[in-house]
Design a protein with these regions (language model features):
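Enriched for short, Lys/Arg-rich terminal
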Residues: 56, 60, 65-93
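Short, solvent-exposed, low-complexity loop/linker segments
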Residues: 23-50
Length: 93
């Protein structure tokens, strides 16, 4: 279950369906990813074809995971037990 968001636009999209804070073209894929993230209990639940799940590296990124939305855009998250926390939507390359 998703507990917390880092990206306000992504939270509004998840809660209300508003695309104001995200790339509108990414909405269908983000919706599928957020549904799956809300239902899964571990990172491997996000390991679907084309999503390119991987653990992030770096001192400050230990415990974070990323899936590819489109191009450079990623959905990143950490897990606290079986809950997703600090869910973010970012162009990080």
């Amino acid at each position: 279950m998703i507990k917390t968001f880092r990206h306000k636009g992504l939270k509004a999209f998840f809660d209300k369906g508003s695309t104001a804070g995200i790339q509108a073209a990414h909405a269908p894929r983000l919706a599928a990813m957020l549904r799956r993230l809300n239902e899964t209990t571990n990172a491997q639940g996000m390991n679907l074809p084309g999503w390119r799940l991987h653990a992030l590296k770096g001192r400050d990124l230990k415990g974070y995971y990323s899936v590819c939305v489109n191009g450079n855009w990623r959905l990143t998250f950490a897990l606290e037990g079986t809950d997703a926390v600090l869910v973010d939507y970012q162009d990080y390359h």
